[in-house]
């Protein structure tokens, strides 16, 4: 599983910038770290990725797409937990003012020290254990590692300040008054949760179902580095699959049962040793309990299929299970789809079981029911604690406040009702808080008792399985995995993009300038447009070899060349990017061959598809 050398990575990133796949934003003003612009080929590749993602997930699973605003009110993200918990730990150089993200600085330093030939075996083992478990470290634990290993500023060796917590959301205000505090969203998921009732209605009240969103999210990175991998504004695609908490099976699980996936479990990581992931089928992983349920397993398998289809190397991918103290505040289990690049393992997809966290907290905060009502085939008895108010005395005592107090009482959990019942039995009264005021209630006003009712409807808050994709990171990993250098010429790099993801499918060029060529160019262009094949005309005066090299750097899989023979017999050459092999045929046959390879996966094999065309000796 060889990785790119630093020189190869420099060559990759030079190619990406030279061919304007991307460039630093506001570059002529000096740029801003963590912000990038996609150029034409980058945009087209991103468009292809989104289209394939929609086909693979939204269309295949009949998902309901939602598109919400990037601006999110403070209350929403306070309720979701992001205001308090969407943080990283950082340290500052008091002399230079430079900030570092603590866990990244530790990783960078310890990896460098592990390369030292004089490091003793015990220190090596300790450092390797830290590196395999650091994602789950708390702030104080990171601080201890910084002190124990005497980690200073990597550039100046200055002693750094103690760690501090930093919230990663961009804060703003909505409206001229500036009184409505808001943030740029850190995820697209909240818009899906808040629209749950509407989505449920569209799905005719039935569970399970899934919604999906594709859009920009924001993260105010402490010290963005590694190019497109760690940025402050990024494109996400998120799925929220709503499921009955008592039944997390999946109707299509048998279709992926035998999908073999590399899994790095929590147990392997906690062993403290550098471990390779274990390859097993998703069926085995679910049956053994390593993966919590069928629905989570189903989406992990589908994610694996998708990533391999778009050009990710199967030997450089794994699912890594979060450690207990690493999981997000909303998750009960989570597996990260990680891709190995020249920068190391990069988290690109998160598959999390969010349980009922989000719907529960938003329902509690707003007083709006976010539940599913399921009609029972057989009614069931339910015994529970209930609170009943004496309407006559309650209304006369509290007047306009009566309904508000009654609403607060109705939201008491079973544990709260038991506690209040005990207080009522012991003291003859209990208190509760309503809008910041203490309200005293006695047995003449309320009764708390056990009550048995016959239920015809089961009402519950659904659980959520969430696959979340960082599309920008995936795009960089495609670049990393698809970049190759010609064996006979180290200066000639090219991208071996799969046909479906390639930004430009065909480039059309001429061997030289000739009065007869423009009409043929026009004919070929019209034929390609008619078949909806994205192409580019290269009519520059440069040599044919340089034209091939330039379009190889754009990852264009096919090249059509018009030459003097074309004028005589209407034949052209068709060149394949990876092998540089060429065949010759009529314009109609060549375009038909390209169309077949692009639009029919079973016909994508070069030898099979070009069987009727004449090989060209180079």
Swiss-Prot record:
PANTHER family: GLYCINE--TRNA LIGASE, GLYCYL-TRNA SYNTHETASE/DNA POLYMERASE SUBUNIT GAMMA-2
Catalytic function, reaction form: tRNA(Gly) + glycine + ATP = glycyl-tRNA(Gly) + AMP + diphosphate; 2 ATP + H(+) = P(1),P(4)-bis(5'-adenosyl) tetraphosphate + diphosphate
Keywords associated with the record: Aminoacyl-tRNA synthetase, ATP-binding, Cytoplasm, Ligase, Nucleotide-binding, Protein biosynthesis, Transferase
Function (record text): Catalyzes the ATP-dependent ligation of glycine to the 3'-end of its cognate tRNA, via the formation of an aminoacyl-adenylate intermediate (Gly-AMP). Also produces diadenosine tetraphosphate (Ap4A), a universal pleiotropic signaling molecule needed for cell regulation pathways, by direct condensation of 2 ATPs. Thereby, may play a special role in Ap4A homeostasis.
Keyword Transferase listed: yes
Lineage start: Eukaryota, Fungi, Dikarya, Ascomycota, Saccharomycotina
Protein name: Glycine--tRNA ligase 2
E.C. number(s) listed in UniProt: 6.1.1.14, 2.7.7.-
Description of how the protein assembles with itself and partners: Homodimer.
Principal place of residence: cytoplasm
Binding positions for glycine per the UniProt entry: 187, 238, 466-468
Binding site for ATP: 219-221, 230-231, 347-348, 473
Subcellular location: Cytoplasm
GO cellular component: cytoplasm; mitochondrion
